[in-house]
From Swiss-Prot:
EC nos: 1.1.1.23, 2.6.1.9
Cofactors (names): Zn(2+); pyridoxal 5'-phosphate
GO BP, one annotated term: L-histidine biosynthetic process
Official protein name in the record: Putative histidine biosynthesis bifunctional protein HisCD
Binding positions (Zn(2+)): Q261, H264, D362, H421
Organism: Photorhabdus laumondii subsp. laumondii (strain DSM 15139 / CIP 105565 / TT01)
Co-factor remark: Binds 1 zinc ion per subunit.
Reactions accelerated catalytically: L-histidinol phosphate + 2-oxoglutarate = 3-(imidazol-4-yl)-2-oxopropyl phosphate + L-glutamate; L-histidinol + 2 NAD(+) + H2O = L-histidine + 2 NADH + 3 H(+)
Function per UniProt: Catalyzes the sequential NAD-dependent oxidations of L-histidinol to L-histidinaldehyde and then to L-histidine.
NCBIfam families tied to this protein: hisC (TIGR01141), hisD (TIGR00069)
Keywords: Amino-acid biosynthesis, Aminotransferase, Histidine biosynthesis, Metal-binding, NAD, Oxidoreductase, Pyridoxal phosphate, Transferase, Zinc
Length: 807
């Protein structure tokens, strides 16, 4: 075992004490002198404010400052002084940091832990934060971006930045990019004191972020332990790096990465762990070559004096050493790094493969470079959006909810001998029983107790509008982007409409090639889905079958009526698994098949549909949902109705007819089935205005206009597929027969959230079986499609070799 970096250490030959010593970090404990000096600085700033800040700047920074705060004119001048290259680089880095941290926005949690007991978890931004940026010969502009960007995303009301004078123009411009205007030219422990306690010029903040020297680190520690101080981001220590490398690693890259961390300071520590001794020797040689060419080679050499090259018996042993050490930065330069990272339990930030240098994370990949060091990775995490937020829980109990919990709470309070806690319950329960108020604990109304159990447990269908969002490009509901021009002609709103408006039925029958008696008009195809279950399925006896991934209302409707479901997952190509369906037809009364299928966009093989119809003859109703059939009319099987009496077809005016807001759909079936559905349908499913506009839409002239729309959408679809297929972030663009496409992304979450915040709303399909990483994109106008491509292009680089799509 040695303290020299050019000597290999064979881990297996070291006993426990030696192994512990090898992984021991350089001591960083603040000296008594530093602690005492910092304590005096804190006291002086708290007592004398700005006067002390000016005096310390003169004494420590050799600078006389008139104005502690940087003026708007100075900030503007700083921006004008920089060349475009540095400004563009900073903008690109901030964009990536923003994308990654936007994706960290927490969701509101709402649960009913038991009937009448409602609990929430919400987040709020920390009201005021202070950012400390060290001075020196090289401006740490990247740290401004790493701290300022998440503070801005979190919505912190006040963001203060302090840095020693004179503040570099790059730091001022970086602060401007992050929306920071309160910038103060003070450094060292006195800056930490000013932000912790406040002065005449510098506002007091709630939490302080940022690195610094021993005095800054000690000042942060001391103010974090004072009631009148401020909390801090995390304990600080020297920078460190551990590399796990196999025989295939490039020794030039490994050496460069080790030196990039060693040059931070003489107390930095770098460690190479590898099972390949030949690689270790090549790295030593390469370090000697590269070290001589570094301007900071003396600093790096001092850091190397307490760094290590360790040879192990296996990559698994490398992982064990890394987890034991818990590095700030971990680089895994192996042939299959993804397999090893699953075993890593403690690291600040991990860099996978030969092409992921630690400097990428330092500046521009998007992850945060403010990381726990000195072994704190066992309990601390890399800086993120959550560090600028605070969690808050909310609970609300109904009277019945309180009664349901009262005995439990009283028993636990009694066990802890906290009588006042118990009384808080006992008095409320007594109040609910006071006869003078006419309240009886047995008669308190709680709607949840009356609701059917399956409804209490039901997860509602999340329609596009129910999911919310604030956008101007809505591509999540498969609607047409422009409203058609129709005017109401009927003036009989004082009268109830016909149950089945004759003109609508007659015209749709003609359009579909059927008799009017085979057509039922309803409030969208969704109503037909429910009507069929109500007519044909006995709860607790019959079964509804469908094949996910598919339209969610089949499941929700069955669950609403308490009807059992069988879900036969589609094949990999999203065609029907006929064998599995045939083996699961017991008690099945109703089958739903979407063709073209939502959300995958593919038409179902007609041979498969015919096979299902034959298997279920006289046993079950087979419902083919043709909501998107206008985009591929050759795939319609409406003409089969004359041969298959158990066939039902669902249609809508929402898609190609561009009338989603009308809520008008149709059921096509035999006369016998239509007659049964008429028994349970609401008396007036179509309002007079709906029937009026639907009849107009079904004229020959407007059908021709609809068909032109289809041609336009198909052209836009093909162009969008081709454009997306060229982007590196896109794993696959699936073929589609509809007005939407399904796209698989390498990072779907980032794409979805980034576009969401830009006002481009897509449909997230990642929770559907087999659709991991997939988003559904409605085909909008040409301009909307171009915006989608532009937004996703910003997250991706273009492949030189486009992927092939089949369509």
């Amino acid at each position: 075992m040695t303290d020299h970096f050019d000597t290999l250490i064979r881990w297996q030959e070291c006993h426990d004490e030696q192994q512990n010593a090898l992984l021991t970090r350089p001591a960083i404990s603040a000296s008594v002198e530093i602690s005492r000096t910092v304590e005096q600085i804190l006291h002086a700033v708290k007592e004398y404010g700005d006067h002390t800040l000016r005096e310390f700047s003169r004494r420590f920074d050799k600078t006389v400052i008139e104005n502690i705060r940087i003026s708007p004119e100075e900030i503007a001048a700083a921006e004008n002084s920089l060349n475009n290259d540095i400004k563009q680089a900073m903008q690109q880095a901030m964009n990536n940091i923003r994308v990654f941290h936007e994706a960290q926005k927490p969701i509101k949690i709402e649960v009913e832990t038991q009937p009448g007991v409602y609990c929430q978890q919400v987040t709020r931004p920390i009201d005021s934060v202070g950012l400390y940026i060290p001075g020196g010969s090289a401006p740490l502009l990247s740290t401004v971006l790493m701290l300022g960007t998440p503070a801005q995303i979190a919505g912190c009301h006040k963001v203060v930045l302090c840095s020693p004078p004179p503040i570099a123009n790059e730091i001022l411009y970086a602060a401007t990019l992050c929306g920071i205007t309160e910038i103060f030219q003070i450094g060292g422990a006195q800056a930490i004191a000013a932000m912790a306690f406040g002065t005449e010029s510098v506002p007091k903040v709630d939490k302080i972020f940022g690195p610094g020297n021993a005095y800054v680190t000690e000042a942060k520690r001391q103010v974090s332990q004072r009631v009148d101080g401020a909390t801090i981001d995390m304990p600080a220590g020297p920078s460190e790096l551990l590399i796990i490398a196999d025989a295939g690693a490039n020794p030039v890259f490994v050496a460069a990465d080790l030196l990039s961390q060693a040059e931070h300071g003489p107390d930095s520590q770098v460690i190479l762990v590898t099972p390949d001794e030949a690689l270790a020797k090549k790295v030593i040689t390469e370090i000697e070559k590269q070290l001589t060419r570094l301007p900071r080679n003396q600093i790096a050499a001092k850091a190397l004096a307490h760094s290590r090259i360790i040879v192990t018996t296996s990559l698994q042993q490398c992982v064990e050493i890394s987890n034991r050490y818990g590095p700030e930065h971990l680089i895994i330069q192996t042939r299959q790094p993804e397999q090893l990272v699953e075993k890593i339990t403690s690291a600040g930030s991990v860099f996978l493969g030969d092409w992921s240098p630690e400097s990428a994370g330092d500046y521009a990949s998007g992850t945060n470079h403010v990381l726990p060091t000195y072994g704190y990775t066992s309990t601390y995490s890399s800086l993120g959006l959550a560090d600028f937020l605070k969690r808050m829980t909310i609970q609300q109990l109904t009277p019945q909810g309180l009664l349901n919990l009262s005995q439990t709470i009283e028993t636990l309070a009694q066990a802890e001998q906290l009588t006042a806690h118990k009384n808080a319950l006992t008095l409320r329960v007594a109040a609910l029983n006071i006869a003078g108020q006419g309240v009886n604990m047995n008669n308190i109304f709680d709607a949840n107790l009356l609701a059917r159990e399956n409804i209490r447990k039901l997860t509602p269908y999340m329609s596009a509008r129910r999911l919310g969002g604030k956008g101007d490009v809505w591509l999540n509901a498969n609607e047409y982007p422009l409203a058609p021009d129709f005017q109401c002609t009927e003036q009989t709103l004082n009268r109830y409409p016909d149950c089945q408006p004759a003109s609508v039925i007659r015209r749709y029958a003609a359009y579909a090639g059927l008799q009017p008696e085979q057509v039922l008009a309803c409030r969208g195809a969704d109503e037909s889905i429910e009507l069929l279950i109500r007519v044909f399925c006995e709860p607790g006896q019959d079964v509804v079958l469908f094949c996910p991934p598919t339209y969610g209302m089949y499941s929700v409707s069955a669950e609403t009526f308490g009807v059992e479901q069988k879900k036969i997952t589609a094949l990999e190509n999203w065609q029907l698994d006929i064998e599995a369906i045939e083996n699961n037809l017991d008690r099945v009364k109703l089958i739903y098949i979407c063709s073209p299928n939502n959300p995958t966009g593919n038409a179902i093989n007609p041979d498969s549909l015919r096979k299902i119809l034959e298997l279920t003859a006289n046993r079950a109703i087979v419902t083919i949902d043709e909501a998107y059939i206008e985009f591929c009319p050759e795939n319609s099987i409406a003409s089969w109705l004359k041969n298959y009496p158990n066939l039902v077809i669902l249609r809508t005016l929402s898609k190609a007819f561009a009338l989603a807001g009308l809520r008008c759909g149709f059921t096509l079936a035999s006369v016998d089935i239509i007659t049964l559905l008429l028994k349970v349908i609401a008396p007036y499913p179509l309002s007079t205005p709906v029937a009026d506009i639907a009849a107009q839409a079904l004229t020959a002239e407007n059908i021709a206009i609809m068909q032109k729309r289809v041609v336009e959408i198909r052209e836009n679809r093909n162009d969008l597929q081709q454009a997306l297929n060229k982007l590196a972030i896109v794993e696959k663009v699936f073929p589609s027969e509809t007005n939407y496409i399904l796209v698989k992304f390498y990072d779907a979450e980032t794409v979805f959230k980034t576009l969401w915040h830009q006002g481009i709303i897509l449909r997230d399909q990642r929770k559907q079986p087999g659709l991991e990483g997939c988003l559904r994109i409605t085909i909008g106008s040409r301009k909307e499609c171009e915006r989608v491509v532009e937004a996703i292009s910003a997250l991706s680089t273009v492949n030189e070799q486009p992927k092939e799509i089949a369509n």
